Amino acid sequence: LSSAASDVYKRQIHNYLKDEKLTEDLTLTFTKHSEMRYGENPHQSAASYVIPGNVEPNIMNAKIHQGKKLSYNNIMDADGALACVREFDETACVVVKHANPCGVAIGDDILDVYQRAFNADSLSAFGGIIAFNRTCTKEVADAIAKVFVEIVIAPGFEKEALEVFKKKKNLRVLELGKFNKREKKIEIRNVDGGIPVSYTHLTLP
């Protein structure tokens, strides 16, 4: 199974494992979403798959306003950025590069939050992925446009912000719609011969 569909994969697992009851049998069905130029490395073939009917905001069903097709590594990094930023109730920004967060900040003002997250490690943030859990404003878009990043992710974008981003033709802009913090999620690991599955609680009881 391609881990490119990891987030929606977890949601389907959740439907099978309601109330934390681990069933005896688990059947998963996916539909091909798109072919990719290559996988994690140039010599590897790859494709992305989605769960039919899944409507929860995720990278696979995001509205892509502009930019070229997402690569395998783009999807993995974007999914990681989204998973991190959606954990916060406060206004938050997460910067991810090569599957690792290199800047995270929370606060009241989205521009201040972006600047602190980016400046936490501005060298690593160069060419990275930026995710917000609030609507991206024109003011924030103006700041992002001054640096090189691969992808910007947010629940929504002001019309003026999208106009700013249009000047950066290679930038991917992903709109997910409103998403909420989850109390728990399913963790799946792909190992030879099977998949270990467990619940991870995101809030304290």
Language-model regions: role of each:
Residues 10-202:
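ATP-dependent carboxylate/acyl-activation modules
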